[in-house]
């Protein structure tokens, strides 16, 4: 049995291949919070910090877009432009929101929150003024203090399987993980509960309950949330180039599960 402890402050960056596809291309933000812009060969993934009682959105796109609420609590409003239909709901993390083309949405933070948007298109938007006016009014209601942020990129790591970006928000760890086709990640278990959110691609996900030695597996082709319980061995196998998020509280510690870890290492050695 091997225990791995990962210190984000001292993590060494390794670069074995030059064909990695996910990059942090820029960062920005305002008094509402920080924005991180990531780009792969086909996908844009943008992280938005949204401080309590502020709003983002108020526009629509001519392409589908997916939002993932990673941390916090929001009110989410959706307005279908071809009808009178409007949906208003409160959501707590983790949650996945799929927005169809020409559908306006508005996100109002109930607590300090972190969400991402992802899409496969050149960015373009048009204002939906009823929602956009709410964004403007929320800005007017609060005194704009000096920019500060709870969202940070702590480190990054790269090997033949792809890149990992280590983020931290409000004391919780969020890792954006790339998984190349025919490679595997994981092969271990934790003493803590973790969340894995598959964003894009196609992944075969394996779990083994160590108490009963029973295995389950499934193929994931759409965004999906996986709650991984303590002492459940798990592994991700890339059927296509894929991306997912891992989140957890506290110090990272993993204990290898040999049956899965052998697969991870064999795929890396090929």
What do these predicted regions represent?
Residues 46-61, 175-190:
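Conserved short histidine dyad/triad with adjacent acidic residue
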Residues 62-63, 95, 103, 111, ...:
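A generic "binding-loop/recognition-motif" signal
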Residues 5-44, 132-173:
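A short, N-terminal "cap"/entry segment at the start of jelly-roll beta-barrel domains
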Residues 56-58, 76-77, 99, 104-110, ...:
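Short beta-strand His + acidic residue motifs that chelate non-heme Fe in jelly-roll/DSBH
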Residues 81-101, 210-230:
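Short acidic-glycine-tyrosine-enriched beta hairpin
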């Amino acid at each position: 049995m091997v225990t791995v402890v990962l210190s984000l402050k001292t993590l060494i960056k390794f670069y074995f291949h030059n064909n990695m596809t996910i990059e942090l291309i820029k960062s920005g933000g305002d008094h509402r919070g920080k924005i991180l812009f990531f780009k792969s060969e086909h996908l844009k993934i943008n992280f938005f910090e949204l401080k309590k009682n502020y709003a983002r959105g108020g526009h629509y796109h001519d392409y589908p877009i997916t939002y993932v609420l990673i941390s916090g609590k929001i009110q989410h409003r959706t307005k279908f432009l071809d009808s009178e239909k409007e949906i208003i709901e409160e959501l707590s993390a983790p949650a996945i929101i799929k927005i169809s083309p020409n559908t306006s949405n508005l996100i109002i933070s109930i607590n300090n929150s972190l969400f991402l948007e992802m899409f496969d298109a050149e960015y373009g938007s048009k204002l939906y003024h009823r929602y956009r006016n709410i964004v403007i009014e929320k800005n007017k209601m609060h005194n704009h203090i000096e920019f500060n942020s709870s969202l940070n990129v702590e480190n990054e790591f790269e090997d033949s399987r792809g890149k990992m970006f280590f983020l931290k928000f409000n004391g919780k760890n969020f890792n954006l993980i790339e998984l190349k086709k025919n490679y595997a990640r994981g092969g271990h278990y934790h003493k803590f509960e973790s969340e894995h959110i598959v964003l894009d691609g196609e992944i075969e996900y394996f779990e083994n309950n160590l108490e009963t030695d029973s295995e389950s597996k499934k193929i994931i082709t759409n965004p999906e949330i996986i709650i991984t319980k303590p002492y459940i061995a798990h592994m991700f196998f890339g059927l296509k180039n894929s991306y997912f998020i891992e989140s957890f509280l506290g110090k990272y510690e993993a204990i290898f599960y040999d049956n899965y870890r052998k697969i991870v290492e064999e795929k890396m050695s090929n």
